[in-house]
Amino acid sequence: MKKYVLTIVFACLVAANVSAQAIYKEVVAMKAHVEKLMNDSTQNMQTRKVACFKNDALYYLIDKAADTPDFTEYMLGEQATAMIDFVNLYVKRLSQERKKKDKDIVLALFKNASCAHPLFDDPDKEVTYGYVDNEQYITQFALDTDW
């Protein structure tokens, strides 16, 4: 009976490890996709800049996840997906607004949500806030965000 239980436990551990590797590979694939989009000269500059932010945010997540012992691949996958969804929703909401003041309100709401919810509490604000006050990007969000 012990052997049977140990076999089941071992099988579950192996399955969990495969899932973790699959999640990590998916996040790396997401990064490769946005990097390709970022470097695609047939895309307009705004699309490429949004892809640049996504690329940097995914790189930041992967890097910080590797440095944080209790940060699992599952959490990495959740954060990566949430970041992509957050940015896509922001771009969609921004495109729906016609007046500059309404666009500014959307930007302020999303920017404040990003800055108010750090994930890693990274003290390096020069890196984490690199996009926050950069007028050249519509994605003025903190990289250290609990998406």
PLM-predicted stretches and their roles:
Residues 74-147:
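Surface-exposed, polar helix/loop patches in the mature regions of secreted/periplasmic/lumenal proteins
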Residues 1-16:
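Sec-dependent N-terminal signal peptides
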Residues 21-67, 144-147:
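Immediate post-signal-peptide N-terminus of mature secreted/exported proteins
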Residues 48-93:
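Amphipathic alpha-helical interaction modules
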Residues 3-4, 18, 26, 32, ...:
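N-terminal cationic leader/targeting segments used for protein routing and processing
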Residues 19-22, 74:
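A ubiquitous short alpha-helical element
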